[in-house]
Amino acid sequence: MKNEILKIGIVTPAPPGSRHGNRVTALRWARMLRSLGHRVEITQSYEGESHDLLIALHALRSHDAIRRFRCEHPDRPLIVALTGTDLYRDLPKSKLARQSLELASRLIVLQPKAFDALPEGLHAKTRVVYQSVKPFPQIRNPEVPIRNFQACVIGHLREIKDPFRAAMAARLLPASSRVRIIHVGGAMTEKMVASARREMEINPRYRWIGEQPQWRVRQILMRSQL
């Protein structure tokens, strides 16, 4: 398939318009693949389209698409991108998630520690693909002293993400510390809203600002030291 223009399908359970990580990743990967000349279609399921290659995000929730594509096209490449939910919740207890990994030609993980959650027999077909971001322009004079050391946490408030871990760690810092935590991301439940508000009440170092547009998230990231 080298130097060929491929018809590539990307399956993600996240619906169009969603700000969830899987949809954002699908859009970014599609943009990169199109820039290389390939034709890319993003869907929530696989309905028998004649793709040369299928990329499925989420081993468990995309299992039906993975199984059908493998059955209909046993010789075509099938890539399964493992999400954090796959690695740290679903794989230990879901036979379907584990079956998706066996059906894949290649597995993608986003960080090397993910290998620790995978059976050793799958390591050979697993690759780390680091997420990237466009360079930021310099927005501050580096000679101007920084009043606080700002650490930003970017991610939706979901229990599986352990979203308040940074805030809890910040509580242990000495009074002289200048560390401040700013948390960007939507709350998936009212319980998470209440937890975030409670954390702000008891922890002056922590501030949750909810879901923000992409330009604003990038701006916060640029202005953070960590």
Task: For the regions a language model picked out, list residue spans one by one.
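A short, basic/aromatic alpha-helical/loop segment that forms part
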Residues: 158-163, 174-176, 189-191, 211
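Acidic anion/phosphate-binding donor-loop and adjacent secondary structure
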Residues: 90-92, 132-148
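Active-site proximal beta-strand in glycosyltransferases
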Residues: 53-55, 69-88, 106-109, 126-127
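A conserved, positively charged/aromatic
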Residues: 87-105
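Acidic donor-binding loop of glycosyltransferase active sites
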Residues: 222-226
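Donor nucleotide-sugar binding/catalytic pocket of nucleotide-sugar-dependent glycosyltransferases
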Residues: 102-139
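Nucleotide-activated donor-binding/catalytic signature segment of Leloir-type glycosyltransferases, i.e.
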Residues: 185, 193-216
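Conserved donor-binding/catalytic core segment of Leloir-type glycosyltransferases
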Residues: 145-161, 167-173, 181-184
